[in-house]
């Protein structure tokens, strides 16, 4: 296995188990906007893409609706947690000198309210969020922005994520991709690596 100097993480479904928060709040918004109750599996597409894009696909986007979704999602904050064992592995990687980053489709205010309190920000030198680029996953722009800020060679970087959008973003930017099987519900045939547990992250670096 190739060893990398930089390990970059997606947030939702990779670092943090946010599925209940995202999908339950989205279901509530759809109910409010349309009066319909959609089956949970029909909402899975919203995992890993910007909220605006999800609402546009559902044909219910407005800034007010997006703001309302953020408000409702915050009420599910107690359901969000770091995947078991992951914080310890991240600390080990950071202590060993591996450079860690985040590339996420979350907005900065959502991240600050729901994700930052989980306590892993101190390990990440660069955190790329939706406001940092004009194009978003699956486009390569967010990863390219990480590479620019970190001064990193794409060949020395691996992106860990849970969706096809993550893989497409990484591949388009010339970066290797590792599927976080502990949070992924998707088959990702083009993944370079398939990590079954957080401990498998330690195999990605010699540092």
Task: Identify the meaning behind each predicted range.
Residues 42, 80, 102, 156-158:
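Residue-level marker of alpha-helix boundaries and capping positions
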Residues 14, 104, 162:
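Conserved G/P- and acidic residue-centered "switch" motifs that form tight phosphate/ATP-binding loops
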Residues 2-88, 94-96:
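N-terminal helical cap/lid subdomain that shapes the substrate entry/recognition surface
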Residues 85-89, 142-145:
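Well-ordered alpha-helical segments embedded in enzymatic catalytic cores
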Residues 1-5, 94, 108, 112-207:
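Asp-based, Mg2+/Mn2+-dependent phosphohydrolase catalytic module
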Residues 17, 102-104, 179:
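Hydrophobic residues in well-ordered beta-strands that form the structural core
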Residues 26, 89-115:
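Substrate-recognition element of Asp-dependent hydrolases with the DxDx(T/V) motif
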């Amino acid at each position: 296995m190739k060893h990398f100097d930089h390990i970059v993480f997606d947030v939702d479904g990779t670092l943090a188990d946010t599925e209940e928060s995202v999908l339950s709040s989205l279901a509530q918004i759809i109910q409010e906007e349309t009066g319909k109750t959609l089956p949970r599996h029909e909402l899975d597409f919203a995992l890993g893409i910007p909220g605006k894009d999800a609402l546009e696909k559902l044909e219910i986007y407005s800034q007010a609706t997006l703001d309302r979704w953020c408000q409702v999602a915050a009420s599910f904050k107690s359901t969000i947690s770091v995947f078991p064992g992951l914080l310890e592995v991240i600390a080990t990687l950071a202590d060993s000198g591996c450079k860690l980053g985040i590339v996420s489709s979350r907005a900065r205010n959502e991240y600050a309210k729901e994700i930052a309190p989980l306590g892993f920000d101190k390990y990440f030198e660069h955190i790329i969020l939706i406001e940092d680029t004009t194009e978003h996953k699956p486009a390569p722009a967010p990863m390219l922005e990480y590479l620019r800020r970190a001064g990193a060679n794409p060949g020395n970087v691996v992106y860990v994520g849970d969706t096809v959008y993550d893989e497409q973003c990484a591949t388009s930017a010339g970066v290797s991709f590792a599927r976080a099987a502990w949070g992924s519900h998707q088959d990702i045939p083009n993944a370079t690596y398939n990590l079954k547990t957080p401990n498998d992250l330690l195999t990605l670096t010699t540092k």
